[in-house]
């Protein structure tokens, strides 16, 4: 009888490894947490304590979290939520959270953002601006940006297809499995498949080129998976924001999380949560106050990718080799190993680094943690659209400023060639005028009107292991041309200051590509065929 009951809550009833499949997240987390405080098996705990009391999980968490403040147990329950129709300002604030949450956001590459709702383009209309004298100006500026974007989608797709005709590319012939030019394909299914690959990659290219026109108010969707502790912190951060949108999102997210992991997020708005919100506001205000007295504004125009902090390669190599040897060393301290490593000849040290470089046979073979001991800081100012891609990397320190029009914007060459440079500049100039007018009274809300093409200042500090992951990933052929170039510049600058250590980044692609998505679309189509 017990086995029958357990089968609905655990993947098996007698093995020593099993999945917890009981429906309620709060019970799953409470079972794991309770597990650490008894010598009973988890299935026994479930039968003895949870089966007869459907509120047992919540009661347990209320006691542990509220009475003892044991934060770590809030990591044992997870939830998945979807947020639709939030701005690109709010989604970046959410995605600033690095630990315990995973995100998947609507793409600006695969989806055109030209749809209207009730006759209006889909962008966020901030309530503070809506009730101000700037309401019409804001509406007109965002609408104009969308109009220029929307009316040029088809012309840009046509231009891309003219510049990169399908006849120029090779596709797989299903009969002999060889790559052949499009004109040489005979099989109807192969021709259809080739057209699908070509249409997908050319549309992606066109949308990549045009995305700079989109304002930060553009509405997007994001899915989030995370644990209770991380969600609680997210709610605290959003609640402390000066933006109404982010405050309202905090309330909506909390309401929905209460349907699945209520006990984990209860404290986000209690007296401790309110105190934490006040602390976050105080930190921001104190920083703003000190900065206004000590730092003079000095905005630079144009894009920047510059390494500004690093250590000597000699010291860096010693640290990495010490860490490589630490795990396998015979009961020897880090300090002692370091002293011994310093006595190894330079050539021997280079050879050691090269040995570990040889072991990597693809980019997913990450360097070991030893390579986390060396750091680089980059001063960056790139278009906001590109920043959104780099922002996804979280195993690093990233600080960023408010989005403004102070640093100029980038124009893709294709915009000029297609003959829409004037339209593009008109949109940028209109944005700048509106932004400058609104920012005096609403410095935070004025961000919404700024286009993705405008340059955005931030800095990133990361270790060599993360540099390897970030740069190799962001230089893959299918990447957006903007972030590929920045990642390539990062590699060149690291290579200049650390020519030996940078060898570990052996899968950096320094080439330029016509249709970035083409080869990737081909691989996807091959996989699709195998699934049929």
How should these model regions be labeled?
Residues 1-532:
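A conserved ligand/cofactor-binding region detector
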